[in-house]
A protein has these predicted regions:
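Membrane-embedded alpha-helical bundles of multi-pass enzymes
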Residues: 2-156
């Protein structure tokens, strides 16, 4: 059963954005490997266009939007799971707050990943495999990142 899941195409398509999100944190300090973004962002774009094109051909209805949402959501979970670990460090200074550490590690990335999920959901119907779609992809993801920072009063 597990072998069938691991060999399926959907497992690869949905786990790839998660690992891309995990790896993208290496472009920030203290690692500062900024060239990783030049690999990760086009790879995420290609995954979204592949799923959008493939799902439209298979379903011919609207369930492909759900797939696009989960691709962005899993990318966001991976990105914030590896990028917000520092919040748990601030909860270790008080004995009463140590109970919140598992919630801070799990629930914050699950919530913040929704922003990337809604970005890819909104982007889905407009996606083609060309330069203008890539520009729109970067614009929508930048806009949702800006909104995330302003909605949550400057949370990085």
């Amino acid at each position: 059963m597990l072998e069938k899941i691991l060999n399926s195409r959907s497992f690869i398509i949905f786990s790839l954005p998660f690992f891309l999100g995990l790896i993208s944190v290496f472009s920030f300090q203290p690692f500062n490997f900024t060239f990783i973004n030049f690999i990760i962002i086009p790879a995420l774009f290609l995954v979204i266009t592949y799923v959008q094109k493939r799902s439209k051909n298979i379903y011919r209805k609207k369930p492909y939007l759900r797939n696009l949402f989960f691709i962005g959501y899993f990318f966001g979970i991976g990105f914030f799971l590896s990028g917000t670990y520092w919040i748990s460090y601030s909860l270790t200074f008080d004995e009463n707050l140590k109970l919140l550490i598992p919630f801070s590690i799990i629930l914050i990335p699950l919530f913040l990943g929704l922003f990337f999920g809604f970005a890819s959901l909104f982007l889905g119907p407009f996606m083609r495999n060309n330069y203008s779609s890539f520009f729109l992809f970067c614009l929508i993801f930048s806009l949702t990142d800006y909104l995330r920072g302003n909605i949550l009063s400057g949370f990085p």
